[in-house]
Amino acid sequence: MNITQVKIKKLENFSGSLPEYATEHSAGMDLIAANEQPITIKAGEIQLIPTGIAIALPYSFEAQIRPRSGLAVKHGITVANSPGTIDADYRGEIKVILINLGTQDFVIEKGMRIAQIIISKYERILWEESSILTETMRGSGGFGSTGV
């Protein structure tokens, strides 16, 4: 397994621990809320939650912010723009856009695990305009065409 080092900066509002893998085969690392005061997310509302960290990804890497399944299933709290993308050239604070899809208000406390961050390699592409695309068995079928 290859391991890539990524620089991480603790900002003034940082608290808790740096993101880390929970198990040997975890894909994501938990992000921790770094809000000074509790933030209430009312049912149906969206809030931007600080994490107190900034990162310097190597070029050809991206980070995705994804929901934590426990928050989603127990409280209806998820990442509104899931997955949120952090580009390699972004150097600002990582913030998480949470939405409350539940029926009860939910309070985000400082130090709470609010989302996961997954770091991945990507490739850039160059579009080649064409009037003909190769045929496939699926063709243009989409949006449930292969079953529910």
Swiss-Prot record:
Top-level taxon in the UniProt lineage: Bacteria
Catalytic reaction annotation: dUTP + H2O = dUMP + diphosphate + H(+)
Cofactor(s) required for function per UniProt: Mg(2+)
Keyword Metal-binding included in the entry's annotation: yes
Residues that bind substrate: 68-70, 81, 85-87, 95
Hydrolase listed as a keyword: yes
One GO BP annotation of this record: dUTP catabolic process
Keywords for the protein's UniProt record, in alphabetical order: Hydrolase, Magnesium, Metal-binding, Nucleotide metabolism
The enzyme's E.C. designation: 3.6.1.23
Pathway: Pyrimidine metabolism; dUMP biosynthesis; dUMP from dCTP (dUTP route): step 2/2
Gene Ontology MF, one: dUTP diphosphatase activity
Family: Belongs to the dUTPase family.
Function: This enzyme is involved in nucleotide metabolism: it produces dUMP, the immediate precursor of thymidine nucleotides and it decreases the intracellular concentration of dUTP so that uracil cannot be incorporated into DNA.
Protein name: Deoxyuridine 5'-triphosphate nucleotidohydrolase
Species name: Rickettsia akari (strain Hartford)
UniProt lineage: Bacteria, Pseudomonadati, Pseudomonadota, Alphaproteobacteria, Rickettsiales
Gene this protein is translated from: dut
